[in-house]
Amino acid sequence: MSTLLEKTRKVNRILQKTGIQPVDFNEMANILKDVIEANVYILSRKGKVLGYSILKDYGNDIFAQSKIIPEEYNDKLLRVTETLANDKGNLFKEDKVLSDLILTIVPVNGGGDRLGTLALSRGVKEFTDDDLILAEYGATVVGLEILRSKNEEIEDEARKRAVVQMALGTLSYSELEAIKNIFEELNGKEGLLVASKIADKVGITRSVIVNALRKFESAGIIESRSLGMKGTHIRVLNDKLLEELEKMKR
């Protein structure tokens, strides 16, 4: 049987991957399932099931069957502000499956905020102090990974916005007017562009439109495909483009 130290080291390996591989909450849940020997569910603050791993199937399990758990379930989880150990039939009295299981609920916190919930379930055997130590350590690791995931998302959003702003900055006045009218005409993330129609509307040459599109395509903001006489199919690859163009209207 693995000792508490050996189990803690297994959980710690998750941290060793931080920054090297994308966050995989299913893998994290699987490791916690193995060391704690329980069903494990990792949920976001809004009740989205980020990852889970099943040791034993107990039937109609709301945590495993839903991408987002019902709001009333999540509200109950969020009201748990410190580890709730070995709950049986109190937290989810109305749920026939969960009320028959032994549940341990561990809040996931980070940066002073509630980030989510780590939920564990068993059929008969209660969670020991060692199990709770591993669960709380696991919740800390989950919190760090959620924070990292959020930071990566923020950085990616900032990078995409910067690329769009730089590309817009390279446009001449005529090219900028062409871009504004192109995406006003598309009215979405993709569609068919008839360059001559835009040229006549704005009072510019087709070459101005072509140059503007080339700049955006080389920046990886859009992709275009000629359909001959029908026009050009445009697809937005960077969703920050539409946001930045919308700001210009204000």
UniProtKB/Swiss-Prot annotation:
SUPFAM superfamilies named in the record: Winged helix' DNA-binding domain (SSF46785)
**Where's it found, cell-wise?**
Cytoplasm
Which cysteines does the record link by disulfide bonds? none
Instruction: Spell out the Pfam families in the cross-references.
Output: CodY, HTH_CodY
Region annotation (GAF domain) maps to: 1-147
Query: Keyword set for this entry?
Result: Cytoplasm, DNA-binding, Repressor, Transcription, Transcription regulation
Q: Among its keywords, does the record have Nucleotide-binding? A: no
Task of the protein = DNA-binding global transcriptional regulator which is involved in the adaptive response to starvation and acts by directly or indirectly controlling the expression of numerous genes in response to nutrient availability. During rapid exponential growth, CodY is highly active and represses genes whose products allow adaptation to nutrient depletion.
Which family does the entry's similarity section mention? Belongs to the CodY family.
Listed name of the protein? Global transcriptional regulator CodY
Q: Which organism is it from?
A: Thermoanaerobacter pseudethanolicus (strain ATCC 33223 / 39E)
Gene for this protein?
Answer: codY
